[in-house]
């Protein structure tokens, strides 16, 4: 008895249109052939004029731009169908490198002096001081094992969950994402303790004791392992 032919494509109708789940193990040629057959034999009710959005999910298959365009063209040639998105669970090497740069902890040991700017894409672990007039910028969080007396800008690319922490927090200015705060007032007792800065629910930057950080940002425990 012949085995039932493996179905490489599943079509599901949703309120947003159609979702096509494409198998990620068969050959691309086989995939296109079955896609053409299935879209030719299925008739989708409509007024004959409205376009139906198609969302394509290809799983763990990497598609080149040429292959993506082949899929778009095939679907576009069917009645009233237009591709809204093609989603893959696979990322390119360039995307992986960019993600690594944005999420890794970059340890740097130096003093950032007046007029100097230190900028990293990911999380910054600075072992040293930021002098008045110096500036540190990070796409993620900023950790200063030393004195922060200059300007610090965390979440540079828009991450409002980013934080700034320093052994001695006495900055000229703090920035997190697009939120800015002026230098906090000098402590009356002159005490210099480790503190952190974060954006609260009112979209204001708050400076508080460092011990609160694990409660405010539980995910930072993963970064702590990277630091250790």
UniProtKB/Swiss-Prot annotation:
Quick check: keyword Nuclease in the entry?
A: no
Q: Name one GO biological process term.
A: cell morphogenesis
Note whether Cell cycle occurs among the keywords: yes
Keyword terms, alphabetized = Cell cycle, Cell division, Septation
- Which SUPFAM superfamilies does its entry note? Cell-division inhibitor MinC, C-terminal domain
Purpose of the protein: Cell division inhibitor that blocks the formation of polar Z ring septums. Rapidly oscillates between the poles of the cell to destabilize FtsZ filaments that have formed before they mature into polar Z rings. Prevents FtsZ polymerization.
Q: Which PANTHER family match?
A: SEPTUM SITE-DETERMINING PROTEIN MINC (PTHR34108:SF1)
NCBIfam families per record: minC
Under the subunit heading, UniProt states: Interacts with MinD and FtsZ.
Task: Give the family, as the similarity comment puts it.
Answer: Belongs to the MinC family.
Q: What is this protein called?
A: Probable septum site-determining protein MinC
Could you tell me which species this protein originates from?
Answer: Bacillus cytotoxicus (strain DSM 22905 / CIP 110041 / 391-98 / NVH 391-98)
